[in-house]
Amino acid sequence: ILGAGMGQIPFINLLKERGCYVIAVSVKGNYPGFEIADKCYYVDTRDKEAILEIAREEGIDIITTDQTDVSVPAVAYVAEKMGLKGIGCVTAEKFTDKYVMRCYAENAGIPVPKFIQVNCVDNIIDKVSRMDYPLISKPVNSSGSRGVHRIDNPNELVEKVKMSLDSSVDNKVIIEEFIEGKEY
């Protein structure tokens, strides 16, 4: 299982109750999953090649994650490379990259807010000129609301987009029109 934090504990416990040998992979830290897993590796859960190497060495039958989007691409990659059941890399990208997800939804005829992807703040005011405020900026590949900022007017635009860029792993941010409503 990729991840060893509080979000993964119920799933690790369930796997162990069902007699599974559980290997937890996550960056080094004080994560409770390391204490209950049968074996641990301290590796970034986005490092696909390192995780593939571990998976091959261990001869795993299943790879999964729970409660974290950032690990999904690595799970899909390893499953594809090892011929295990999984969602596949293309589906994982559609699920975890907010820009790719929006493009896919738009192309499928699903209504989406106006959006753009940026990797810097150069000419940012021109780039959003056809969008209505408020806006939202967020890293395309983050989860847990990290780097998400509401932008109420053009005066906040550069600062908030920079903050989102600072939270982005690959320096990509999506800016989209804000939609009022409940978050699910």
Regions found by a protein language model. Name each.
Residues 7, 70, 96-97, 131:
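A generic structural signal for residues located within well-ordered alpha-helices
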Residues 97-180:
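Active-site nucleotide/adenylate-binding loops and adjacent lid/helix of ATP-dependent enzymes
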Residues 64, 94, 150:
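Conserved SAM-binding loop
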Residues 183-184:
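A short beta-strand signature within small-molecule sensing/ligand-binding domains used
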Residues 1-91, 122:
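ATP-binding N-terminal substructure of ATP-dependent carboxylate-amine bond-forming enzymes
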